[in-house]
């Protein structure tokens, strides 16, 4: 059965499902294809939750992307009418001269993120389950939280269908062929 779509997304994991949602709500005729039932337990999206945070210690350049991702998760929650991002706060512990805490501080200062730097005594007082060694500190970010990945996948795919898109699970892409301004996908 031949069908015509504006966009075909091969692989409906976390990224593919989100891409299908964004495209379908902009009015594109979208087909998402995955070789497994969507969602499934074979991808990086499998499992209950993932941590989400703004103070990205790896590099401050990621912070604008993370701010945008928080806004998009909020949009998804609003449209799907379900909770996907649960703010819990996040505590990061490490040597005061290590990579994690100084990296979080750098990102937070560069992007004016709300945070708390906790000395050893403050960590022990506020979080008694942690007794830090000399030279270790804590970094607390109230905006950090838990992202419910499988509910997010379900929300994305349900909304794709609400916007007129299709998600085909248990369908394997055998090959594809580009010709001019179109692409044929054979399953």
What are these regions (language model features)?
Residues 2-15, 31:
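Beta1/beta-strand and adjacent pyrophosphate-binding region of the FAD-binding site
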Residues 20, 24, 159:
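Gly/Ala-rich phosphate-binding loop of Rossmann-like dinucleotide-binding domains
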Residues 24-45:
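Glycine-rich FAD pyrophosphate-binding loop
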Residues 26, 111, 163:
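Conserved dinucleotide-binding and phosphotransfer motif residues
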Residues 36-38, 121-123, 156:
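Short beta-to-alpha linker loops that shape the active-site pocket of alpha/beta-hydrolase fold enzymes
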Residues 49-126:
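Dinucleotide-binding Rossmann-like beta1-alpha1 core, especially the glycine-rich loop
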Residues 100, 127-135, 177-184:
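A short, glycine/Asx- and small/polar-enriched loop/turn
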Residues 140-187:
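Helical element adjacent to the flavin cofactor pocket in flavoenzyme catalytic cores
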């Amino acid at each position: 059965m031949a069908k015509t779509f504006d966009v075909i997304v091969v692989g409906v994991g976390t990224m593919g499902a989100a891409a299908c949602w964004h495209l379908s709500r902009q009015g594109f005729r979208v087909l998402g294809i995955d070789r497994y039932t969507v969602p499934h337990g074979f991808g990086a999206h499998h499992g209950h939750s993932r941590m989400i945070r703004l103070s990205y210690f790896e590099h401050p350049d990621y912070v604008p992307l993370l701010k945008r991702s928080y806004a998009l998760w909020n949009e998804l929650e609003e449209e799907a009418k379900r909770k996907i991002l649960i703010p819990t706060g996040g505590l990061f512990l490490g040597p005061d001269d290590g990579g994690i805490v100084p990296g979080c501080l750098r990102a937070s200062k560069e992007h004016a993120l709300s945070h708390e730097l906790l000395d050893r005594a403050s960590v022990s007082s506020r979080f008694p389950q942690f007794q830090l060694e000399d030279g270790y500190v804590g970094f607390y970010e109230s905006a950090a939280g838990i992202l419910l990945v499988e509910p997010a996948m379900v929300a994305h795919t349900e909304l794709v269908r609400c916007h007129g898109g299709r998600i085909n699970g248990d369908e394997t892409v055998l090959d594809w062929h580009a010709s001019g301004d179109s692409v044929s996908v054979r399953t």
